[in-house]
């Protein structure tokens, strides 16, 4: 389901309630840029996805009876750590996660490439904790079309190279 104007307004309202710490912005941007330059983008993505997996393991979710309960649990965790909100939809052969008001670092568009693998690791582990198939992974399906628009992530079966199968 594509994000709507209401989804963007929800994110803007969320950002207005949050206080982003400016003390780490430049440090984190420099650290990630240096890290990616030294190890390359593929290894950086693997590391960041593993970091997201570890975050999810440190913030485990109890088994949920349905997607609505899972959405509520994820939103509760994300509210506690200031990482935005999600809406979860069942698709044809995948589960779609609409993630808005994700951490925002005002350092250009490059930061998004660092955040996405972290989120992919988090969602992959959380869905596995719900009894998800080990052959499934969370992968970015669509980047935001405008600033503040939600990310679209699909949880689905992976191919032999680790990419999610289908669109």
Task: Enumerate the predicted regions with their spans.
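N-terminal accessory segment detector
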Residues: 1-94, 102-112, 146-148, 163-167
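Short, hydrophobic/π-rich interface segment
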Residues: 91-145
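C-terminal edge-of-domain segments
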Residues: 141-165
